[in-house]
From Swiss-Prot:
It comes from Staphylococcus haemolyticus (strain JCSC1435). It comes from the Bacteria. NCBIfam families: DNA_bind_WhiA. Residues 274-308 bind DNA. This is Probable cell division protein WhiA. Keywords: Cell cycle, Cell division, DNA-binding. GO terms for biological process: cell division; regulation of sporulation. Belongs to the WhiA family. GO terms for molecular function: DNA binding.
């Protein structure tokens, strides 16, 4: 199972009281439900591809309204041939929609009804229902951090974005071809959202993966930095050795001043060590890194003069 499927399975096992159950069911039906007329009778169909979500819808309707509900299973014919689960109720359909704030005076309302988000627990429950209906979250082990909730109706999606941001989640809203999404891109905010809607097992897994990824990224940055510094050190050392070899060939190291002769011989003999380590090997006593660099720069300048044919004065 995917990370998102595991999370939805966890969410469907949360116990809620009646007001929170209504808030959750309101989001589920508003986003995945449809009202139709069959044999002069109104019918509510709520569709999902997740079996545990279908069972959740079934149990919430039975519990709150005590009406008969059936679950139909259809096979999806396009692309992935997943099952589609349809929860259907033919009893008190308009009354159910009216009580859940979805139907008012015979007209469908696409905004989030205020009666469904009266307090903190109901707001959390509504967001949980919205995620069960249209939510997805990337597997944190294999891709970038991303959580979204899709809704067919732009004003409902904007309402979800606003509701998420009432908890400081920095959610963004984006229009898509067949609807709109409210989404999160920050790992910390995704963690907060998982906690907010009760996905605590998913939160623990997400945080475990996040810690490992952050550590791996930190190590990679450190290794890259160390590698870059090492490459610079090796490149500089190679140039210094080339300059010293040219001076040896054209002038002879014994003709150099003592301080330059000693550092030249040390560099050729110890090409792999740092400037600091070279400075600690000076016979008259340790000198600083900048002091070593100054002497080596003098040797490079001398070699450049030899290459350009300038007059050499020692």
């Amino acid at each position: 199972m995917s990370f998102a499927s595991d999370m939805k399975n966890e969410l469907t096992r949360i116990d809620v009281d009646e007001s929170n159950a209504k808030a959750e069911l309101s989001a589920l039906i508003r986003m995945n439900g449809a009202l139709s007329l069959s044999n002069q009778q109104f019918v509510i169909n709520i569709q999902t591809e997740n079996a545990t979500t279908a069972r959740r819808i079934y149990s919430l309707i039975k519990r709150i309204f005590n009406v008969e509900v059936e679950i139909l299973v259809r096979k999806k014919m396009k692309l992935k041939k997943n099952n589609i689960y349809i929860c259907r109720t033919k009893v008190r359909a308009k009354e159910i929609l009216d009580e859940l704030g979805i139907l008012k005076n015979g007209i469908f309302v696409h905004d989030i009804d205020a009666s469904m988000i009266k307090d903190d627990e109901m707001r959390r429950s509504y967001l949980r229902g919205a995620f069960l209906a249209g939510g997805s979250v990337n597997n944190p082990e294999t891709s970038s951090y991303h959580l979204e909730i899709f809704s067919q109706y732009e004003n409902h999606s904007e309402g979800l974005t606003k509701l998420m941001n009432s908890y400081g989640l920095n959610a963004k809203h984006l229009e898509r071809k067949k609807g709109s999404i409210a989404y999160l891109k920050e790992a910390e905010k995704i963690s907060d959202f998982l906690s907010l809607i009760g996905g605590y097992q998913a939160l623990l897994k997400f945080e475990d993966v996040r810690i490992v990824r952050d550590m791996r990224n930190s190590v990679n940055r450190l290794v890259n930095c160390e590698t870059a510094n090492l490459n610079k050190t090796v490149s500089a050392a190679m140039k210094q050795v080339e300059s010293i070899q040219l001076i040896e060939q054209e002038i002879g190291l014994d003709n150099l001043p003592d301080r330059l002769r000693e550092i030249a011989k040390l560099r050729v003999e110890h090409q792999e060590i740092s400037l600091k380590e070279l400075g600690e090997m000076i016979s008259t006593g340790p000198i600083s890194k900048s002091g070593v660099n100054h002497r080596l720069r003098k040797l490079n300048e001398l070699a450049d003069k030899i290459r350009s044919g300038e007059k050499i004065e020692l």
